[in-house]
Amino acid sequence: MLSIGMLLLLFGMFREKYASSDSASEATQTNVEQVGKVKNIIFIIGDGMGPNQINLVGDSANNFERSHSIGFSKTYSASHRVTDSAAGGTALACGVKTNNGVLGMNADSVPVQSIMQELRQSGLATGEVASCRITHATPAAFYAHQVNRGMDAEILSDLYKYGPDVFVAGGNKLISTDSLQNAGYQVTYSLDSMANIADGKVACILAEEDMPTSPMRGDTIAQGVLQTLRLLEKNEKGFFLFIEGSQIDWAGHGNEGERLRAEMKDINRVIGVCMDYADQHPGTLVFITADHETGGLSLPNEELTPTFSTGSHSGVMVPFFAYGTGADKLTGIHENTDFKALLLSLVDCR
């Protein structure tokens, strides 16, 4: 596990390396400070993504290095020193520690609204894009309120009632098209057909269960993000978009080094798309973090060969990165429960 001292050293190295950026980056940072309040939030979770996973992206076109600020997040849950994705996702989405396995509730099983739900009540559009099924623990933490992450039928009921305005994910095997349509969704099964939808609620379901692994799914997630942004940006008040690199976690569980490298390169591509969008749309904040680290990854030799110490999650702190409007307010070491309030405090409509 990384010690506090090592984390602070990494933090200092990042600050030193990027404090003296080129003139273009300095101009971007100046614009960031001038814009003020945030209109749009793009919240990205790399499930299972610890500090060493980020090294697998490589030095070429590493979009994490474009970040305006960086910090670290503590990931323990209310019940365990090592969290699962349900409790970790709930902490990030709802701002409360809860027990492993619980979605959208505190440790006493009382439902708590997520940042996505609160911003929708304030009039913002909402969206989700994930490489897993839409009912999986992390995406579900932003809309569901259930005592057990395995309660698929109940989570689906919450999706129909409280789900995002637009989503791109898997899960067709479980989902009822009639129920989605009754909830006001236009249902589509390809990004090409999604591109023909001008506005309104949209469910784009791209797999029976979870999406294929990277690189077999190509740039599906990045393209899904672009399609979702196209629809969400029509809301003049702004939007909240949640994105998950779901299968980083699964590669860690399987101790599959090259699969992990491919998944990290995919989320890096998605982050680049989002940062480019923020450059073109002042008032947009891109926030990137993880719910936990998976695999106890180390990179012990010159070839950076992925080496794992566990097939489960670990208890290390995970990094977070911020880019765009308000990024300067997000730095340091935080509880994972801090980010909901921090992000809400930056939003223009509140």
Language-model features: where?
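Bacterial Sec-dependent N-terminal signal peptides
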Residues: M1-A24
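N-terminal catalytic scaffold of extracellular/periplasmic and nuclease hydrolases
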Residues: Y18-G171, S176-M194, G200, E293-R350
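Structural motif
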Residues: F43, C204-L206, F240-E244, F287
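Metal-dependent active-site segment of extracytoplasmic phospho-/sulfohydrolases and closely related
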Residues: P51, K265-E302
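Gly-rich Lys/Arg/Thr-decorated short loops/hinges at beta-loop-alpha junctions or inter-strand turns
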Residues: G95-N99, A203-T213, D249-G254, F321-A322
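Functional beta-strand-loop-alpha-helix junction segments that form "active/interaction loops"
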Residues: N106, T188-V225
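Active-site His/acidic residue clusters
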Residues: A137-Y143, E208-M211, R217, V225-L229, ...
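Active-site proximal loops enriched in glycine and acidic residues that flank catalytic Cys/His/Asp
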Residues: I243-Q247, G252-G254, M264, I288-T294, ...
